[in-house]
Protein backbone atom coordinates (compact mmCIF):
# COMPACT_ATOMS: atom_id res chain seq x y z
CA UNK A 1 0.00 0.00 0.00
CA UNK A 2 1.33 3.44 -0.90
CA UNK A 3 1.41 6.11 1.76
CA UNK A 4 -0.61 9.22 0.98
CA UNK A 5 -0.81 12.67 2.46
CA UNK A 6 -3.96 11.94 4.45
CA UNK A 7 -2.24 9.00 6.15
CA UNK A 8 0.34 11.25 7.85
CA UNK A 9 -0.14 12.00 11.56
CA UNK A 10 2.00 14.05 13.96
CA UNK A 11 4.44 12.08 16.12
CA UNK A 12 3.11 11.06 19.55
CA UNK A 13 3.69 13.88 22.05
CA UNK A 14 4.52 16.44 19.35
CA UNK A 15 1.25 18.31 19.79
CA UNK A 16 0.09 19.08 23.31
CA UNK A 17 -2.79 21.25 24.43
CA UNK A 18 -2.03 24.58 26.10
CA UNK A 19 -1.98 24.32 29.90
CA UNK A 20 -4.62 26.55 31.49
CA UNK A 21 -3.06 27.77 34.73
CA UNK A 22 -4.82 29.02 37.84
CA UNK A 23 -7.84 26.72 37.47
CA UNK A 24 -7.70 24.66 40.65
CA UNK A 25 -5.11 23.11 42.96
CA UNK A 26 -4.77 19.89 40.99
CA UNK A 27 -3.58 21.52 37.77
CA UNK A 28 -1.12 24.44 38.14
CA UNK A 29 -3.55 26.31 40.38
CA UNK A 30 -2.78 28.80 43.17
CA UNK A 31 0.47 30.56 42.09
CA UNK A 32 0.13 29.37 38.48
CA UNK A 33 3.85 29.05 37.81
CA UNK A 34 4.66 32.57 39.03
CA UNK A 35 6.38 31.59 42.28
CA UNK A 36 5.53 33.31 45.55
CA UNK A 37 5.27 37.05 46.09
CA UNK A 38 7.34 39.72 44.36
CA UNK A 39 6.50 42.07 41.51
CA UNK A 40 6.36 39.33 38.87
CA UNK A 41 3.87 37.35 40.95
CA UNK A 42 1.45 40.26 40.89
CA UNK A 43 -0.12 41.74 37.75
CA UNK A 44 2.47 43.20 35.33
CA UNK A 45 4.95 46.10 35.11
CA UNK A 46 4.72 48.84 32.46
CA UNK A 47 6.89 48.37 29.37
CA UNK A 48 8.93 51.52 30.15
CA UNK A 49 9.46 50.66 33.85
CA UNK A 50 13.17 50.67 34.69
CA UNK A 51 13.07 49.19 38.18
CA UNK A 52 12.78 52.51 40.01
CA UNK A 53 15.58 54.21 38.09
CA UNK A 54 14.55 57.59 36.64
CA UNK A 55 12.93 56.63 33.33
CA UNK A 56 14.31 57.79 30.01
CA UNK A 57 11.30 59.94 29.12
CA UNK A 58 11.83 61.93 32.34
CA UNK A 59 15.62 62.17 31.97
CA UNK A 60 15.41 63.85 28.56
CA UNK A 61 14.94 67.65 28.43
CA UNK A 62 11.63 69.19 27.47
CA UNK A 63 11.30 71.17 24.26
CA UNK A 64 11.51 74.90 24.92
CA UNK A 65 9.38 77.60 23.34
CA UNK A 66 6.24 77.12 21.30
CA UNK A 67 5.03 77.09 17.69
CA UNK A 68 2.91 80.07 16.73
CA UNK A 69 -0.30 78.66 15.21
CA UNK A 70 -1.00 81.98 13.43
CA UNK A 71 2.36 82.17 11.62
CA UNK A 72 2.08 83.18 7.95
CA UNK A 73 4.33 81.18 5.63
CA UNK A 74 5.46 82.62 2.32
CA UNK A 75 6.90 80.95 -0.75
CA UNK A 76 10.13 82.77 -1.54
CA UNK A 77 11.45 84.02 -4.87
CA UNK A 78 14.76 85.83 -5.12
CA UNK A 79 15.41 88.88 -7.30
CA UNK A 80 17.96 86.75 -9.18
CA UNK A 81 15.25 84.18 -9.96
CA UNK A 82 13.02 86.91 -11.41
CA UNK A 83 15.93 88.13 -13.59
CA UNK A 84 16.49 84.55 -14.84
CA UNK A 85 12.80 83.77 -15.46
CA UNK A 86 11.93 87.13 -17.05
CA UNK A 87 15.06 88.24 -19.02
CA UNK A 88 13.01 90.72 -21.09
CA UNK A 89 11.47 92.37 -18.01
CA UNK A 90 7.87 93.61 -17.92
CA UNK A 91 4.95 92.71 -15.64
CA UNK A 92 5.53 89.97 -13.04
CA UNK A 93 2.56 88.73 -11.01
CA UNK A 94 1.96 85.71 -8.80
CA UNK A 95 0.15 84.03 -11.73
CA UNK A 96 3.22 84.54 -13.96
CA UNK A 97 5.48 82.99 -11.32
CA UNK A 98 3.09 80.02 -11.00
CA UNK A 99 3.08 79.59 -14.80
CA UNK A 100 6.91 79.54 -14.85
CA UNK A 101 6.96 76.98 -12.02
CA UNK A 102 8.72 79.25 -9.52
CA UNK A 103 5.97 78.99 -6.88
CA UNK A 104 2.82 76.97 -6.21
CA UNK A 105 -0.63 78.41 -6.77
CA UNK A 106 -2.90 79.61 -3.95
CA UNK A 107 0.09 80.44 -1.73
CA UNK A 108 1.51 83.73 -0.44
CA UNK A 109 4.68 84.90 -2.22
CA UNK A 110 7.57 86.95 -0.84
CA UNK A 111 10.43 88.39 -2.91
CA UNK A 112 13.89 88.29 -1.31
CA UNK A 113 16.90 90.36 -2.33
CA UNK A 114 19.43 87.67 -3.35
CA UNK A 115 20.87 88.07 -6.85
CA UNK A 116 21.10 90.93 -9.34
CA UNK A 117 18.49 92.54 -11.57
CA UNK A 118 19.37 94.42 -14.78
CA UNK A 119 15.99 94.81 -16.52
CA UNK A 120 13.01 96.89 -15.38
CA UNK A 121 10.23 94.73 -13.93
CA UNK A 122 6.90 95.65 -12.37
CA UNK A 123 6.52 93.03 -9.63
CA UNK A 124 3.18 92.55 -7.87
CA UNK A 125 3.31 90.00 -5.02
CA UNK A 126 2.26 89.69 -1.38
CA UNK A 127 5.48 90.86 0.35
CA UNK A 128 9.00 92.20 -0.31
CA UNK A 129 12.16 92.53 1.74
CA UNK A 130 13.80 95.94 1.89
CA UNK A 131 16.79 94.85 -0.21
CA UNK A 132 14.48 93.38 -2.87
CA UNK A 133 12.56 96.68 -3.16
CA UNK A 134 15.86 98.59 -3.48
CA UNK A 135 17.20 96.31 -6.24
CA UNK A 136 13.94 96.40 -8.22
CA UNK A 137 13.81 100.22 -7.94
CA UNK A 138 17.51 100.53 -8.88
CA UNK A 139 16.84 98.55 -12.08
CA UNK A 140 14.03 100.96 -12.97
CA UNK A 141 11.11 98.76 -11.93
CA UNK A 142 8.36 98.95 -9.34
CA UNK A 143 7.51 96.73 -6.38
CA UNK A 144 3.80 96.62 -5.51
CA UNK A 145 2.40 94.66 -2.58
CA UNK A 146 -1.02 93.04 -2.91
From Swiss-Prot:
SUPFAM superfamilies: Ribosomal proteins L15p and L18e. PROSITE patterns: RIBOSOMAL_L15 (PS00475). Keywords: Ribonucleoprotein, Ribosomal protein, RNA-binding, rRNA-binding. GO terms for molecular function: rRNA binding; structural constituent of ribosome. Residues 15-28 have a biased composition (Basic and acidic residues). InterPro entries: Ribosomal_uL15, Ribosomal_uL15/eL18, Ribosomal_uL15/eL18_sf, Ribosomal_uL15_bac-type, Ribosomal_uL15_CS. Pfam families: Ribosomal_L27A (PF00828). Residues 1-46 are annotated as: Disordered. GO terms for cellular component: cytosolic large ribosomal subunit. One of its GO terms (biological process) is translation. Binds to the 23S rRNA. Part of the 50S ribosomal subunit. HAMAP family: Ribosomal_uL15. Belongs to the universal ribosomal protein uL15 family. This is Large ribosomal subunit protein uL15. It comes from Rhodococcus opacus (strain B4).
Amino acid sequence: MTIKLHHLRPAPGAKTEKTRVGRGEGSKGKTAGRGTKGTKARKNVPAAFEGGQMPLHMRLPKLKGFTNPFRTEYQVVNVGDIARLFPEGGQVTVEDLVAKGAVRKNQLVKVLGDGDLTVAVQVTVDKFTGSAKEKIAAAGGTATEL
